[in-house]
Amino acid sequence: MAQAKILIVDDDQDIRRLLGIRLKSRGYEPVFAGDAISAVNQARKEHPDLILLDLMLPAGDGYLVVERLKAMPALEGIPVIVVSARDPVAEDERFIESGADAFFRKPFDYDELLTAIELALGTEPAA
């Protein structure tokens, strides 16, 4: 079975690197984007199995990224997990309208995020 490809979108290079290392150690193939425009371009190019998306990005809002991706037939079924420092309660309406699948507030618990990734991908939790 091929590795699941996960697009990590965050303007913080340290977060991208850390998540990439952790996900790669669990058998996932991480790909990266640091802003809204590259997120859409990378998604088109890489066709990831899942997207981890920050909301506060250069060159556009994370919700606009979700809306653009969900509007593309080739990408509309890709699960999107938002990982942001924003307050999820304050973001609730926009989050629901965007079509994103889950919301984690930074700092997040990596094991909980991993469980959400596995559920979204329909894979068994790694031992």
Q: Where are each of the predicted segments found?
A:
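Charged docking surfaces used in two-component/phosphorelay signaling
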Residues: R17-S25
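Alpha4 helix (beta4-alpha4-beta5 surface) of REC/receiver domains from two-component response regulators
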Residues: L64, D87-F104, D111, T115
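Active-site beta3 strand of CheY-like receiver
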Residues: E46-L52, L57
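The feature encodes the CheY-like receiver
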Residues: R16, P58, E76, P88
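Acidic catalytic/metal-coordinating carboxylates
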Residues: D35-S38, D61-E67
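Residue-level signal for the "D+5" position in two-component response regulator receiver
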Residues: F32, L57-G60
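Short hydrophobic/Thr-rich beta-strand motif most characteristic of the beta2 strand and flanking loop
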Residues: G27-G34, Q42
